[in-house]
UniProtKB/Swiss-Prot annotation:
Residues 273-295, 302-313 have a biased composition (Basic and acidic residues). Keywords: Chromosome, Citrullination, Coiled coil, Host-virus interaction, Nucleus, Phosphoprotein. This is Coiled-coil domain-containing protein 86. Residues 1-313, 328-360 are annotated as: Disordered. Required for proper chromosome segregation during mitosis and error-free mitotic progression. The gene is CCDC86. Residues 153-164 have a biased composition (Pro residues). Residues 1-12, 238-254 have a biased composition (Basic residues). The keyword Methyltransferase does not apply. Residues 345-360 have a biased composition (Low complexity). InterPro entries: CCDC86, Cgr1-like. It comes from Homo sapiens. GO terms for cellular component: chromosome; nucleolus; nucleoplasm; nucleus.
Length: 360
């Protein structure tokens, strides 16, 4: 049987406390008796004892902690167990806690245990010291726990959904709080490390950071809603009577709109536009007058040309005075058509006519 040797290896790194710790053996016995009387408080009915003994043959290793929060695992003792211990990786202090929880291994940690007897020089005070610390913590945790506080809660595992505030997370087994493996100074009291505080009665334990975040978000949510309601009042828009729902109600009709000053023209601009209109009218009238003048000039020139032509023709006429009327009687009709009568008074005045003139 090499079990005492393993226990001596595991407990080799711890320093013995002052001899005052030997007086706590009686308190350890009382705590162990109380723990034996009701072992169902810290263990579920369906949990087998073989799970609790999983770390008996494991060598001495530091406890596995998550990379983000080493203190969170130590403070999660009574609030929520971390799950079943991994075989071969559990710390020696946790193995002692598991031995205390199982009723089959409880006689090994009593003061009369044969495993503490092979080396009484160094290991006897160490065993009693560890048992005294565990017993004091068990008694303190039992006093702090209230009947209404649930004991089986799991912390929020990364990757698993967080339980709701009214929902209890299932847990396989409760576990005792993890102890610090660093050796304490001889003068430091036993209760120096921070024990995990259980939640108050009537509250369910959820993830610490998740609960804080939810509380902060719930406190900020109503404030933002109030601000939104105050800033943006909702005014429902009804359907217009005309049925033209695409028209904007903020726009007014053209008859109701007032003209701005930029729409009114200045006096200088008005006078300039009036002058431009007057010039255009004058130019148009001038063009009409020119056209009429040219027409009149052309008409007058035509009349003058006609008059001049008539005068030229009259000057070019050959006048023959027929003094014998019988000659006219003998003339043919064709010749008579070409004969025209002229007033020869002027000619007669120059030359006194003896006979009426006749143009042949």
């Amino acid at each position: 049987m090499d079990t005492p040797l393993r226990r001596s290896r595991r407990l080799g790194g711890l320093r013995p406390e002052s001899p005052e710790s030997l007086t706590s053996v009686s308190r350890t016995r009382r705590a162990l008796v109380e723990f034996e009387s009701n072992p169902e408080e810290t263990r579920e009915p369906g949990s087998p004892p073989s799970v609790q003994r999983a770390g008996l043959g494991s060598p001495e290793r530091p406890p596995k902690t998550s990379p983000g929060s080493p203190r969170l695992q130590q403070g999660a003792g009574l609030e929520s167990p971390q799950g079943q211990p991994e075989p071969g990786a559990a710390s020696p202090q946790r193995q002692q806690d598991l031995h205390l929880e199982s009723p089959q291994r409880q006689p090994e940690y009593s003061p009369e245990s044969p495993r503490c007897q092979p080396k009484p020089s160094e290991e006897a005070p160490k065993c009693s010291q560890d048992q005294g610390v565990l017993a004091s913590e068990l008694a303190q945790n039992k006093e702090e726990l209230t009947p209404g506080a649930p004991q089986h809660q799991l912390p929020p595992v990364p990757g698993s959904p967080e339980p709701y505030p009214g929902q209890q997370a299932p847990g396989p087994e409760p576990s005792q709080p993890l102890l610090e493996l660093t050796p304490r100074a001889p003068g430091s009291p036993r209760g120096q490390h921070e024990p995990s505080k259980p939640p108050p009665a009537g509250e369910t334990v959820t993830g610490g950071f998740g609960a804080k975040k939810r509380k902060g978000s719930s406190s900020q949510a109503p404030a933002s809603k109030k601000l939104n309601k105050e800033e943006l009042p909702v005014i429902p828009k009804g359907k217009p009577k005309s049925g033209r729902v695409w028209k904007d109600r903020s726009k007014k009709r053209f008859s109701q709109m007032l003209q701005d000053k930029p729409l009114r023209t200045s006096w200088q601009r008005k006078m300039k536009e009036r002058q431009e209109r007057k010039l255009a009218k004058d130019f148009a009238r001038h063009l009409e007058e020119e056209k009429e003048r040219r027409r009149q000039e052309k008409k007058q020139r035509r009349a003058e040309n006609l008059k001049r032509r008539l005068e030229n023709e009259r000057k070019a006429e050959v006048v023959q005075v027929i003094r014998n009327p019988a000659k006219l009687k003998r003339a043919k009709k064709k010749q008579l058509r070409s004969i025209e009568k002229r007033d020869t008074l002027a000619l007669l005045q120059k030359q006194p006519p003896q006979q009426p003139a006749a143009k042949i």
